[in-house]
């Protein structure tokens, strides 16, 4: 069997992997794992990834379970354009510099609104307002550092061309936008960067990948989202409790 990607497009890293594969014409079999329905907790999926998370890449018997590793693997195996993951040592190091910072400062911060506005209420949990406010402040600080440290006078995060760093960052920053927090407002530098990245990726592909998250708030308001099964509640409550 060929390349399989286990994804849920509500997940930021899943979207990054999906967009990358589509943009670069990489053939793959999409295996949708519906997180809201708890499909990641199934015995069948745990045989693919015992960590019970997406995205997952399965290439024959070879399995990868971290989005950055997946993107690097796809870049190398399919010999995509060099700008994505540059061969030049210093340019590549700059991509890794951002990805390291991203994991600590962006990844766990910009997804919190999905939990406070959608996932928590789905299981009857209200996140304290002081946590919501702290998260809002953390996002503002992270955005400022993203601009000051990485974008500066550059067109893209790691230089003058799109890299994996831009794709990973964009997908995280889209998450709060979809949930009613326009964090690009009043930030012309960040807005221009977003427009450049989306123009490169293509409007049609971005719309396709972003549609599930862009519609989730409306679905929640209409109560048309699936309610997570009881076996998912414990892990969801633990994740909510870990919101700083």
UniProtKB/Swiss-Prot annotation:
Its main location: cytoplasm. Residues 2-82 form the GST N-terminal domain. Its EC number is 2.5.1.18. It is found in: Cytoplasm, Cytosol; Nucleus. Residues 88-230 form the GST C-terminal domain. SUPFAM superfamilies: GST C-terminal domain-like, Thioredoxin-like. InterPro entries: Glutathione-S-Trfase_C-like (IPR010987), Glutathione-S-Trfase_C_sf (IPR036282), Glutathione_S-Trfase (IPR040079), Glutathione_S-Trfase_N (IPR004045), GST_C (IPR004046), GST_C_Theta (IPR040077), GST_N_Theta (IPR040075), GST_Theta (IPR051369). It catalyses: RX + glutathione = an S-substituted glutathione + a halide anion + H(+). It is an enzyme of class 2 (transferase). One of its GO terms (cellular component) is cytosol. It comes from the Eukaryota. Keywords: Cytoplasm, Nucleus, Transferase. PROSITE patterns: GST_CTER, GST_NTER. One of its GO terms (molecular function) is glutathione transferase activity. Highest values found in liver followed by testis, adrenal gland, kidney, lung, brain and skeletal muscle. In liver, highest expression found in central vein limiting plate hepatocytes. In lung, expressed mainly in club cells of the bronchiolar epithelium and, at low levels, in type II alveolar cells. Glutathione binds at residues 40-41, 53-54, 66-67, 104-107. GO terms for biological process: glutathione metabolic process; response to salicylic acid. Homodimer. Belongs to the GST superfamily. Theta family. Catalyzes the inactivation of reactive sulfate esters in carcinogenic arylmethanols. Highest activity towards ethacrynic acid and cumene hydroperoxide. This is Glutathione S-transferase theta-2.
